[in-house]
């Protein structure tokens, strides 16, 4: 069980998953559709942003779907293996899960015509060298 506060802007290491998360702020980003990256309306996110593992009863509101859904049900619908579910990062603000890492963003956090500041989050695997350095600490 882990919860790590993201450095915004900056790079945050998520050791339990062997990942790093890069957070960048700008007025606009090119709309690059990649599963390891999302663009959010930075002003719609409240409080500290965290990355964490799933917890019993977690819910989120996937974009394009009316209402909310349990994370467990979302994983089942997406046919994500049970063993893999523990390794999927969940990105949250103080109110809700806004991104199921590498899968789906929620409706609320998406940028729109009135967006003034964008936040781009990108997930990368830590290299073996970075993992060795961190194990030595």
Regions found by a protein language model. Name each.
Residues 1-137:
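AMP-forming adenylation/ATP pyrophosphatase catalytic core
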């Amino acid at each position: 069980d882990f919860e790590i506060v993201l450095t915004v802007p900056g790079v945050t290491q998520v050791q339990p998953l062997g990942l790093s998360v890069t957070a960048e702020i700008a007025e606009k980003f090119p709309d690059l559709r990649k599963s390891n990256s999302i663009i959010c309306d930075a002003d719609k996110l409240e409080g500290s942003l965290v990355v964490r593992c799933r917890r019993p009863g977690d819910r989120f509101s996937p974009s394009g779907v009316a209402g909310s859904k349990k994370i467990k049900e979302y994983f089942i619908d997406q046919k994500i293996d049970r063993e893999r579910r523990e390794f999927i990062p969940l990105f949250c603000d103080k109110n809700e899960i806004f991104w199921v890492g590498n899968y789906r963003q929620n409706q609320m956090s998406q940028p729109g015509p009135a967006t003034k500041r964008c936040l781009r989050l990108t997930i990368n695997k830590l290299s073996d060298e970075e993992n060795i350095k961190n194990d030595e600490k």
